[in-house]
């Protein structure tokens, strides 16, 4: 590490502890303080590498409160390493306010590259990677999430999302509805771990696979969706909803859903939710 005081943005393993780079390990051992998203989680990594550098918690709930103390630490000539629980800091993790404040204070901000779940999944997905957009976590609420996907359905770039295990089933069903059940996609989970899975299929198939999966849904998922063809018009989901609405006007819900699923390829459970919300009185 140079003698220049700096805020180091250090990427840490997303599962396999061997993925910490020698440079990252050295910097974590040499800085005066480590700002960690969760000190309990990061302690396991530091203990594994025999690193005894003091830590302080920096997460979304205390980042603004911690800024004065951390900036003062840097002004005193003591470098800080920022780490998240796993992967590259600031990629759907805290740290933005600290990095911005360091720049404004004239303090060097130095990236120490390494693991990132989004990029690892993209590299193994087999989807176009010359243009892509990282969209982070979709909204938790169904209506907002559907709108979130709908607004991105015509984007020609490969889209990368993170999702939690308790929302992955609903999110994939909503993606299939808004992007179209036949849109190419990839689900990646447990990356670099023993039960690593990278599965490529149509969105409708992935939604059904996850819903039927017998293995526990643990850890965060990365979902990658192929971009819409440049010539694409309105999202396929809009056609599916129109077809469903026409059928609901003439048929019972169960029959309308069955026919709409056969016509559009959208999963029945997704169409059934729409039917309950939209069936005319």
Model-identified regions with their sequence ranges:
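Conserved helicase motor
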Residues: 57-64, 138-141
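Class I SAM-dependent methyltransferase SAM-binding "motif I" and its flanking Rossmann-like core
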Residues: 97-155
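Short active-site oxyanion
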Residues: 27-34, 106-110, 158-159
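Glycine-rich, flexible N-terminal cofactor/catalytic loop recognition
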Residues: 1-60
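A contiguous loop/helix-start segment that scaffolds small-molecule binding in enzyme catalytic cores
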Residues: 4, 158, 165-281
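A glycine-rich beta-strand to alpha-helix segment
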Residues: 75-120, 166-170
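General beta-strand structural signal in soluble alpha/beta enzymes
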Residues: 36, 111-114, 161, 187
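Loop/turn-to-beta-strand initiation segments
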Residues: 5-7, 77-81, 157-158
